[in-house]
Structures are given as C-alpha cells and as structure tokens.
C-alpha cells in the first residue's frame, strides 16, 4: 500500500493537472453523490490535501471530496477526451478543458461541508501528518511520551495512523534502522538522546522520501537521493556496520533489520 510520500506526490500530480481550472464536467458513480455533479460543474479545485492516506479535494464553493484509496483505489490523470484502457471500475471523474482526473476502484468516497470536515470519523482519528511542514520534532517527542502512546511497541505504533499519519511499513523499517532500534522498544524506555533522534527521524525520513520522488522502485532508489537502507534487502550487508540484514514479521507485516547494529 502506498505510504504518505507516495500519496502526497499523487496529490501533487492531481493538483498540477486541474487546480484553478473551471470544471467542465463532473461525474460520480455512487447515487448519493449524483446531486453534487451539477453543483461542482463550473467550480474550481482550490487545493488537494492529504491526511495520511486520505485525499481531500477542496472546491471553490466550500465543498470537499473525501476519498480513501484503501488497498485498490487509484487516481489517474489523462488528457480530456482520452479513453483509458483499463479493467478498473470508475468512481469519480473531474474534467477541465484540457485535463481530467479519474478515481478508480475506491469505495470510501464522501462529499463533506466545512463543518462535516471537523467531525468526520476518520479525520478525527488520524494523527498529525508527517509531511505537514508545521509539525516539529518537539511535538512528535511530546506525542511519543504521551500516556496514549508511551507504552506502545514501535513495531505497531509506527503503523498506527492515529499516532502519526502517513507512516507505513517501509518507513517503519527505515526509521528504526536510522536510530539503531528494534521494533520491540517503547518510548518510555528510551533515553533523551534516543528520543530526540527518533523524533527527528520520524519527520526527516518521510520528508526525504517525498522530496526525492517517493517510492520509485522498492528494491532500488527513491529517486536520485533516497535509497532503502534495509527494505527488501535481506541477506545483504548493512552499510552501517557490515552485518547481514534479516527479514522477519512484526505486526503481521514484513520487517527488515540488522541484528548487529539495531538493539
């Protein structure tokens, strides 16, 4: 499943295609959304926001389209008039004069008012987004040490979107390697230096992945700069210590680690 950096880059691509352009045609597959087709035609997409793995498409009339891709949903950008060759089921079409964005296969789609945005169940549960530039390491550290999270093992905590939105499995692996910790640790057991290092890594690594083009190839590189240190590299030598990277399962997900330098 795509993680925060990939979701944000997808949103960037959608924004680049249609932001600020009048919508010439709007289509929804679900009956409960049909009344909004006419309301949105002629409106502008003002921005596309990410909250973890959810997308919020904001329109100039104050409405917001909430969509969560879950496992199978995917957005596509096409030239207006193009007919894509796909077996996927179309759910949403937002068309402008030159570009059209399409949402396929997703089922978690809603139209929200500004007031409903503040009470939506998923948006209420989800934690601060690691790609939100306003989020600081100090705030992350306070969150780690809060009663809600301080007793949680990192193996599960770093997959929990209510802790920090946008994290996922490859980020969990890379963050824990960066700070030299295994997934069994808890925030309450770390010393000050470890807490500070983890608080920074929880923001620095997702942001590096995003700025260097996200998950381009799971085995190789995140664009030009971001390269997996451990993920999908079991059996290879750890570049920090020379130990052999191992693969196991933590919280029902594949986990890669170096037994020699992660303690």
Swiss-Prot record:
SUPFAM superfamilies: Glucocorticoid receptor-like (DNA-binding domain), N-terminal domain of MutM-like DNA repair proteins, S13-like H2TH domain. One of its GO terms (molecular function) is damaged DNA binding. Binds 1 zinc ion per subunit. It catalyses: 2'-deoxyribonucleotide-(2'-deoxyribose 5'-phosphate)-2'-deoxyribonucleotide-DNA = a 3'-end 2'-deoxyribonucleotide-(2,3-dehydro-2,3-deoxyribose 5'-phosphate)-DNA + a 5'-end 5'-phospho-2'-deoxyribonucleoside-DNA + H(+). The keyword Lyase applies. The active site is at 2 (schiff-base intermediate with dna), 3 (proton donor), 53 (proton donor), 253 (proton donor). A zinc finger (FPG-type) spans 229-263. PANTHER family: ENDONUCLEASE 8. This is Endonuclease 8. It comes from Salmonella typhimurium (strain LT2 / SGSC1412 / ATCC 700720). The lineage of its organism: Bacteria, Pseudomonadati, Pseudomonadota, Gammaproteobacteria, Enterobacterales. The gene is nei.
């Amino acid at each position: 499943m795509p993680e925060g950096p990939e979701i944000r880059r997808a949103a960037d691509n959608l924004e680049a295609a249609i932001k600020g352009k009048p919508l010439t045609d709007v289509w929804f597959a679900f009956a409960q959304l049909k009344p909004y087709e006419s309301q949105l035609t002629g409106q502008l997409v003002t921005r596309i926001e990410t909250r973890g793995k959810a997308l919020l498409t904001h329109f100039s009339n104050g409405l917001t389209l909430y969509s969560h891709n879950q496992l199978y949903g995917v957005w596509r950008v096409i030239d207006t008039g193009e007919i894509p060759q796909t077996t996927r089921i179309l759910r949403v079409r937002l068309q402008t004069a030159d570009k059209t964005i399409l949402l396929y296969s997703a089922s978690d789609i809603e139209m929200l008012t500004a007031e409903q945005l503040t009470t939506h169940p998923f948006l209420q549960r989800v934690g601060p987004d690691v790609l939100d530039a306003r989020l600081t390491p100090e705030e992350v550290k306070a969150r780690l040490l809060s009663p809600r999270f301080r007793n949680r093992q990192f193996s599960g905590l770093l997959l929990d979107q209510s802790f920090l939105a946008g994290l996922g499995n490859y980020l969990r692996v890379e963050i824990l390697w960066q700070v030299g910790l295994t997934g069994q640790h808890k925030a309450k057991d770390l010393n000050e230096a470890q807490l500070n290092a983890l608080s920074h890594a929880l923001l620095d690594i997702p942001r590096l992945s995003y700025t260097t083009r996200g998950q381009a190839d799971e085995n190789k590189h995140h664009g030009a700069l971001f390269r997996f240190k451990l993920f999908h590299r079991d059996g290879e030598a750890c570049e920090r210590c020379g130990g052999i990277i191992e693969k196991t399962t933590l919280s029902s997900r594949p986990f890669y680690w170096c037994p020699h330098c992660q303690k």
